[in-house]
Amino acid sequence: MQRYFIYFCYDGTAYHGWQIQPNGVSVQETLQNALSTILRQRVEIVGAGRTDTGVHARMMVAHLDLAEEIECEQLTYKLNRLLPRDISVFNIQPVDSNMHARFSAKWRTYRYFIHTRKDPFLRNYSYESPYPLDFELMEQGAELLKQHQDFAAFCKSGADNTTTLCTIKESKWVKTSPYSWYFEITANRFLRNMVRATVGTLILLGRHRITIKDLERILEEGNRSQAGESMPGHALFLENVEY
């Protein structure tokens, strides 16, 4: 068997997340069906992670195993002809059999986009804050995250995680215009809803609803009910996966 990595991106607006769902169309199902049609065999793929409903990916990786070698450029071309316009395949390449799209990934990077002035051209891919935000204080909060490893406070209640420990490599706010920013976070792994809950908590900080000391306490106690809300998925992008 030969293992292949597929590198692709998607606009998640029309999908119920990455993972196959019984009552909604997923990115995984759409890509698997296209591969199965072209290769004339049932194909199963494994993704680098699971994005939720409405979340996008500028870079996602998945792997599949095939008994016969394929022409990667030709398959890439055929997939892009068959897939809907909101999914695009960049590249397909053979990899060692011990490479795994999910478990071999060392770092994943997400960005969450926010704007503070009404803008019809940003509304589908950025969260419009109805409140003024103190981004200097939010940057202090982002820096604080790198000093912690247990993020139970930002994990969806009832999620089946074996551990809530994560290593944060990068956590920062980046200003892109006088009224738009994005939060960028890179970690070895992410918990369910972790990025959206993190942003929701940093927004509480930016609104002066909580203090840096409160954020420290929330992280140490690991109480999800004390943290901020899970922000809408339409403004969240999986930006990169590193191996």
Regions found by a protein language model. Name each.
Residues 1-243:
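Structured-RNA-binding interfaces characteristic of tRNA pseudouridine synthases
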